[in-house]
Amino acid sequence: MKKIIMTGGGTAGHVTPNLALVPELKKLGYEIKYIGSIEGIERKIIEKEGIEYFPISSGKLRRYFDLKNFSDPFKVLKGVFQAKKIIKREKPDIVFSKGGFVTVPVVIAAHLNKIPVIAHESDITPGLANKLATPYCTRVCVTFPESVKHIKGDKAVLTGTPIRRELLEGNKLEGIKLCGFKDNKPILLIIGGSLGSKIINEIVRKNLDNILSKFNIIHICGKSNLDENLENRKGYAQFEYVNEELPDLMKASDLVISRAGANVIYELLALKKPNLLIPLSKKSSRGDQILNAASFEKSGYSLVLKEEELEDKTLIKKLNYLYENRNVYINNMSKSKMDNGVKNITELIKKYTK
């Protein structure tokens, strides 16, 4: 039996694409193992899938000054030795890396063990982890056509992003039942990313009366961000984080407000959900979400509201515009030729398996 080690972590966006590949890889006869961080979000998600998980030391990679920049390289080095030992023992035929700081030691360790590595970059420009890992990769899968020029060494392959099959098979009635909605108002789903978004949470709750006059709200607000005062608010259902329930909640929604991570926006495209994107600003990111959002806005798939322009009036104005023009966005998304990347990526994995 062929064996693959997968890696990726830090946020759900570095894990869920791996899960999308798992059923197809199993169908192709691969035994799957996973290397991730000790305390990252990926550990709980992967172990829940029944996949053997190997935790390693990992240091966060930062583009800004921090005292931990002096200690974290030693954590990365420790992670390389740990990953090298795991890879030597497990003898995988190939490694698949989805990005995130934990992947750098794994990719380097695979290279040292002469194991081929396929990486995947979701955003238009590569994150720091994938930039550092690219020299040790065999091929780098990309999601946007614009990304090819940003990958060094002629290693880029345009594959699209992998989307979990179950996400496309949600049940609308189950989603509505889960939220306890009793009327027929259109449903607005708000997603702030797996860690939540303080600024989106605050402005939505500040304008709750206004929004609830037109919509029922599903609010995925992130860990420790539930508001106890709103627990029994009619038409408002809040969740810290959802996994199995997400397909049903997505199916139930008519509009979506979201950050602009590549994974989630491609999921919205696949589901043809009219969406308002609020990308992370350059103050708190490297600007990748701004580029992602601009690409989708240009294609007519999304309406965009910059974080710097996020105010009560602009939010309500954009939301009303999106609802009034929802069919235009649905029609534009219906014309998209973007494929689910599962088949393209698994074919590449097959090709480079030792």
From Swiss-Prot:
Its EC number is 2.4.1.227. It is an enzyme of class 2 (transferase). It is a peripheral membrane protein. It is found in: Cell membrane. Its main location: membrane. Cell wall formation. Catalyzes the transfer of a GlcNAc subunit on undecaprenyl-pyrophosphoryl-MurNAc-pentapeptide (lipid intermediate I) to form undecaprenyl-pyrophosphoryl-MurNAc-(pentapeptide)GlcNAc (lipid intermediate II). PANTHER family: UDP-N-ACETYLGLUCOSAMINE--N-ACETYLMURAMYL-(PENTAPEPTIDE) PYROPHOSPHORYL-UNDECAPRENOL N-ACETYLGLUCOSAMINE TRANSFERASE, UDP-N-ACETYLGLUCOSAMINE--N-ACETYLMURAMYL-(PENTAPEPTIDE) PYROPHOSPHORYL-UNDECAPRENOL N-ACETYLGLUCOSAMINE TRANSFERASE 1. This is UDP-N-acetylglucosamine--N-acetylmuramyl-(pentapeptide) pyrophosphoryl-undecaprenol N-acetylglucosamine transferase. It comes from Clostridium botulinum (strain Hall / ATCC 3502 / NCTC 13319 / Type A). The lineage of its organism: Bacteria, Bacillati, Bacillota, Clostridia, Eubacteriales.
